[in-house]
Regions:
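Glycine/proline-rich active-site loop of Rossmann-fold NAD(P)-dependent oxidoreductases
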Residues: 149-162, 169, 198-208, 214
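Mid/C-terminal beta-alpha module of Rossmann-like enzyme folds, strongest
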Residues: 194-251, 291-295
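Amphipathic terminal alpha-helices
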Residues: 277-295
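Conserved beta-loop-beta element that borders a ligand/cofactor-binding pocket
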Residues: 130-153
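Conserved C-terminal active-site "lid" loop/helix of NAD(P)H-dependent oxidoreductases
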Residues: 219, 244-273
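N-terminal Rossmann NAD(P)H-binding glycine-rich loop of SDR-like oxidoreductase domains
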Residues: 3-25
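NAD(P)-cofactor binding segment of oxidoreductase domains
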Residues: 57-98, 102
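A conserved pocket-lining segment of Rossmann-fold NAD(P)-dependent short-chain dehydrogenase/reductase
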Residues: 162-186, 190
């Protein structure tokens, strides 16, 4: 199938693009500049240089495709992009896979797709855009909701890996808040697999949470990182005000959410089988270990 893809050179997109190609799909990536276009071509896909807020361009590319996967989601992009895609795909029944985010659900010890929304300020803009995709007539619109994505030494896990370590005779790694909050997590390659499954088999109007099933606390992750960094597992809590000052109020509010999720629906409905290493394993002996050892 011919797929229009945004965000192809981003963190998640860099795993989605090769997986789509491996599955035999033809991919056209909408990218912002020629340097990104060359990366896409080198990977074996076609590229169009343009702006995701160019409604006429997006509608034409969507019309020419067999469906769309939108990874480059943003508050300043989504309203125009979604409207253009729905225009281009109108009445076709073709798939449109949009990107959500786990923070939309707020603090919750057992997040499922139908859990109530309680987003932090940072992601409050998502709801209306997701509703537009899920409620579209004549389009097989679905939303993949990544939890905190990690892997390949990148992603939000770097806020733990690169956290301040203090000084003195017994330096300690700085936590985010007191570290008691759980994070729902998923490996980037597992997220990529779910996007492909949602495109191929996802049902119209459905949401699929991408959660690998491990929900460690930030303190647990911090202690592992502190051991890998040669700090004997020493960590230091900080106040909410300190976290906000260090990371910015918006990101701090989101990272302080206490969230747990399992991703059960995607497993049952789409046959998704996340099998990437856990974030804990990645910190101890995987893709984040070299940075911890040398920081």
């Amino acid at each position: 199938m011919s797929i229009l893809l945004t965000g192809a050179t981003g963190y998640i997109g860099s795993s989605v693009l090769p997986r789509l190609l491996d599955e035999g799909h033809a991919v056209t990536a909408l990218v912002r500049d020629e340097s990104k276009a060359q990366l896409v071509r080198d990977a074996g896909a076609a590229a169009v240089v343009g702006d995701a807020t160019d409604g006429a361009l997006v509608a034409r590319l969507a019309l020419e495709s067999d469906g769309v996967i939108h990874l480059a989601s943003g508050h300043d992009v989504d309203p125009v992009f979604i409207a253009a895609v729905l225009d281009g795909l109108a009445g076709s029944g073709k798939p449109f896979v949009h990107t959500g985010g786990i923070w939309t659900y707020g603090s919750n010890p057992d997040i499922a797709e139908d859990s109530p929304a309680a987003p932090p300020a940072l992601t409050a803009w998502r709801g209306a855009n997701e509703a537009a995709v899920l409620g579209a007539d004549g389009v097989r619109g679905s939303v993949v909701v990544p939890s905190i994505v990690y892997g390949h030494g990148k992603g939000l896990a770097r806020v733990i890996v690169d956290a301040p370590r203090g000084s003195g005779v017994a330096p300690a790694l700085q936590l985010i808040g007191d570290g008691s909050q759980h994070w729902a997590t998923v490996h980037v390659d597992d997220v990529a697999a779910l996007y492909v499954l949602a495109f191929e088999n996802g049902a119209a109007g459905e949401v699929y949470i991408a959660a690998g099933g491990a929900n460690p606390t930030v303190r647990e992750l911090g202690e592992l990182a502190a051991r890998a960094a040669g700090l004997d597992g020493r960590v230091e809590a900080e106040s909410v005000a300190q976290t906000s000052a260090r990371l910015g109020a918006g990101l701090a509010e989101a990272l302080l959410l206490d969230q747990q999720a399992r991703g059960t629906k995607a497993r049952i409905d789409l046959g998704w089988e996340p099998n990437g290493p856990s974030l804990a394993d990645e910190i101890v002996s995987g893709s984040y270990a070299p940075a911890l050892a040398h920081n």
